Regions:
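Switch/communication elements of ASCE P-loop NTPase nucleotide-binding domains
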Residues: 1-71, 285-288, 292-293, 299-306
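Acidic, Mg2+-coordinating catalytic modules of nucleic-acid enzymes
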Residues: 69-83, 87-306
Length: 306
């Protein structure tokens, strides 16, 4: 329909369209992007606020394959958007959000969009915010493991990086371990020593275990994702995270405090979509205590009272 309107409308004609259809907008963008002016109306209580969206921003989005084939245009017709890392995150968080709203007599006006990983979150958030859409973002805790990605996400929400850089560096420095990599020269020297000193043609179990111990790596980041913020070292790192987390929450970035989605319900093993289905099948009653932790988190994200 949008294509038909755009192709038949003459240069000296105008058309005023009231719509909740993303397909009409997409059709118009396909054939006459320069002629479109989108007026978005948001209602809060008894008041309407009106904003005219920037044509240049629409052109940028439409010329970007990543954004063009996402459901960003659907966001125009929702009160707010939640950006998550994966489709399974979206499914579980939306189920909980709908339930919380239903319990207090409200309807959900939130669209959940999965970004296909942390590395795409900043770009999608920036695009949505440029269209005057209310955006919140839910990354896993290990987003802190990559400064470039984390900085991009923070700055896409207009966070002054310098205001949180010190706290971020304190956290990162406390989580990097000397055992995250294996020193090849040290390993070679140790193996050579064991082989040269051994009088037997075969290595003993003790010698094998010594070599295995040297090969073993330890990552505090992995522990952080499995166990959440409780795995942060006590003291400076914990205080720094609390300060930084508050800054992020104030602008709409809610880091998963337990590490990742699956850590909210540890009674069920697995990962991804299968895990979500298994949880909902095993615990069909959303008022079950097993959901208390995730409901508390989503209530904070949505500013709802439990």
């Amino acid at each position: 329909m949008g294509r038909i309107i755009g192709e038949t409308l003459q240069a000296d004609q105008q058309a005023f369209i009231s719509t909740h259809s993303e397909e009409i907008i997409k059709g118009l963008l396909e054939v006459c992007p320069d002629r479109i002016k989108i007026v978005r109306i948001k209602r809060v209580g008894d008041y309407n606020s009106i904003s005219v969206l920037d044509n240049e921003k629409f052109s940028e989005i439409w010329n970007d394959p990543l954004l063009k084939y996402s459901n960003i245009m659907t966001s125009l017709f929702h009160k707010e958007v939640m950006l998550c890392e994966s489709d399974s995150d979206c499914k579980m968080y939306s189920v909980i959000e709908h339930h919380l709203k239903y319990k207090v007599g409200k309807y959900s006006e939130t669209l959940f969009i999965h970004c296909g990983g942390k590395h795409r979150m900043a770009k999608i958030a920036s695009a949505l915010r440029s269209l005057d859409i209310d955006v919140k973002l839910i990354p896993d805790l290990d987003v802190l493991n990559d400064e470039c990605i984390f900085k991009g996400i923070a700055t896409s929400f207009d966070v002054d990086w310098e205001s949180i850089k010190k706290d971020y560096n304190i956290i990162a420095s406390n989580l990097h371990s000397s055992k995250e990599a294996v020193d090849k020269n040290k390993l070679l020297g140790m193996v050579s020593q064991i082989v040269n000193e051994s009088e037997n043609p075969n290595l003993s179990l003790k010698e094998i275990n010594t070599i295995k111990a040297e090969l073993k790596t330890e990552s505090k980041w992995e522990a952080l994702k499995r166990n959440g913020i409780t795995a942060l070292p006590s003291g400076d790192a914990t205080v720094a995270f609390q300060k930084m987390d508050q800054v992020l929450r104030d602008v709409g970035i809610f880091i998963v405090p337990v590490g990742e989605l699956e850590c909210f319900v540890k009674q069920v093993g697995g990962h991804g979509p299968d895990w979500v289905n298994k949880v909902l099948e095993t615990y069909p009653d959303l008022d079950d205590k097993v959901y208390d932790e995730i409901k508390k988190f989503i209530a904070q994200v949505c500013c709802e009272r439990l």
